[in-house]
Amino acid sequence: MLQATCARIARRFVWRNRMPRRLFIGLFLLPLPLFAAPPKDELAYAVGARLGMRLQQEMPGLELSELLLGLRQAYRGEALEIPPERIEQLLLQHENATTETPRTTPAEARFLANEKARFGVRELTGGVLVSELRRGQGNGIGAATQVHVRYRGLLADGQVFDQSESAEWFALDSVIEGWRTALRAMPVGARWRVVIPSAQAYGHEGAGDLIPPDAPLVFEIDLLGFR
């Protein structure tokens, strides 16, 4: 699991928030030789230090040797000790175990209940609801990291907030959780209607002027291919 964490972090090293203020008192307790030889690549050291501080706060107790092994293999493009699909599974399990149960507004709860009651709807992980608009003929995407799709996105009131002008490629780790859940279950060639709870989309914050807080989203997605 620790190698999995490193592999994900190496692929997606984006800090969305500033780190908390450092505790300077600890610097005076460090052995003097640590300051004697400055790192040859200060940027690399800075990235490693920031990564270490973040992990110490968010995931204390990681085995450092396994952490560095996963980071090294992912960064160098070497074969990983754990298959990509297992990495995704482990990280999702950790996220679910450490994330508070999201609060659903009454309006969203009513909308999702009505959607769930529609004929042909089935529920996936995280409460994502899918229904088949066109049957697919191909295989599932398996451990693919990119998908080729056409889509249209709507709010609960039917207002279109986004749609593709033409088919587009997306990296799976760049889309919302609800999209990943649905796409992992879709066969190539299928067209699905996907209803995503706000907790699997943009949550309490929303997304700018387009998507309000606590908004469930509806997508019509055509899965054309993967790689």
Curated annotation (Swiss-Prot):
The record's listing under SUPFAM superfamilies reads: FKBP-like
Q: What does this protein do?
A: PPIases accelerate the folding of proteins.
Q: What is the reaction catalyzed?
A: [protein]-peptidylproline (omega=180) = [protein]-peptidylproline (omega=0)
Q: What is this protein called?
A: Probable FKBP-type 25 kDa peptidyl-prolyl cis-trans isomerase
Q: Does the keyword Isomerase apply?
A: yes
Q: Which organism is it from?
A: Pseudomonas aeruginosa (strain ATCC 15692 / DSM 22644 / CIP 104116 / JCM 14847 / LMG 12228 / 1C / PRS 101 / PAO1)
- Alphabetical keyword list: Isomerase, Rotamase
Query: InterPro entries in the record, alphabetically?
Result: PPIase_dom_sf, PPIase_FKBP_dom, PPIase_FKBP_N, PPIase_FKBP_N_sf
Q: Which PANTHER family match?
A: FKBP-TYPE 22 KDA PEPTIDYL-PROLYL CIS-TRANS ISOMERASE, FKBP-TYPE PEPTIDYL-PROLYL CIS-TRANS ISOMERASE FKPA
